[in-house]
Amino acid sequence: MSDLTTIARPYAKAAFDFAVDKGQLDQWGQMLSFAAEVAKNEQMNELLTSSFSAEKMAEIFVAVCGEQVDAHGQNLLKVMAENGRLAALPDVCEQFFILKKEHEKEIDVEVISASELSDEQLANIGSKLEARLERKVKLNCSVDETLLGGVIIRAGDLVIDDSARGRLNRLSDALQS
């Protein structure tokens, strides 16, 4: 975990709480996404590491964002500039979307299989995970032929390794102990 992630959490939480109170989660998500892209820009990155005053930096950043960021979003940008934290905007955006998904009871699940899974198999995996996790599940599927067979499922901190490679590794560990 990077230092910027730790720095970003309180800003993301404040933006998230405000957005929930105002019923503007999607709007804030769009504003933060735009501001994060601006912060990632190479020229803007040079500005963020320059010796401009915090006030001037905030003024420039807000001007670049223009109408994409409302007055409340501009206030967040100004506070972050005053504290020298504009470089953390991409992490603030990421943390905001983590909070948003948690709030909306959604979770991204990575499904890695040895071969392409059928729609029926994916629907079965999705429904079982939704029941177990009590969340709406979004499956991100990929193929890794080195698994030999089976699947690996990653959902947040939960990892289910039901691959042939995983089973062989567990068997090997059991035989060696």
Swiss-Prot record:
TM region(s), chain numbering: none
InterPro entries: ATP_synth_OSCP/delta_N_sf, ATPase_OSCP/d_CS, ATPase_OSCP/dsu
A GO molecular-function annotation: proton-transporting ATP synthase activity, rotational mechanism
GO cellular component, one term: proton-transporting ATP synthase complex
Superkingdom of source: Bacteria
NCBIfam families xrefs: ATP_synt_delta, PRK05758.2-2, PRK05758.2-5
Subunit-level organization: F-type ATPases have 2 components, F(1) - the catalytic core - and F(0) - the membrane proton channel. F(1) has five subunits: alpha(3), beta(3), gamma(1), delta(1), epsilon(1). F(0) has three main subunits: a(1), b(2) and c(10-14). The alpha and beta chains form an alternating ring which encloses part of the gamma chain. F(1) is attached to F(0) by a central stalk formed by the gamma and epsilon chains, while a peripheral stalk is formed by the delta and b chains.
Similarity comment: family membership: Belongs to the ATPase delta chain family.
Function as written in the Swiss-Prot or TrEMBL entry: F(1)F(0) ATP synthase produces ATP from ADP in the presence of a proton or sodium gradient. F-type ATPases consist of two structural domains, F(1) containing the extramembraneous catalytic core and F(0) containing the membrane proton channel, linked together by a central stalk and a peripheral stalk. During catalysis, ATP synthesis in the catalytic domain of F(1) is coupled via a rotary mechanism of the central stalk subunits to proton translocation. This protein is part of the stalk that links CF(0) to CF(1). It either transmits conformational changes from CF(0) to CF(1) or is implicated in proton conduction.
Protein name: ATP synthase subunit delta
Organism encoding this protein: Vibrio parahaemolyticus serotype O3:K6 (strain RIMD 2210633)
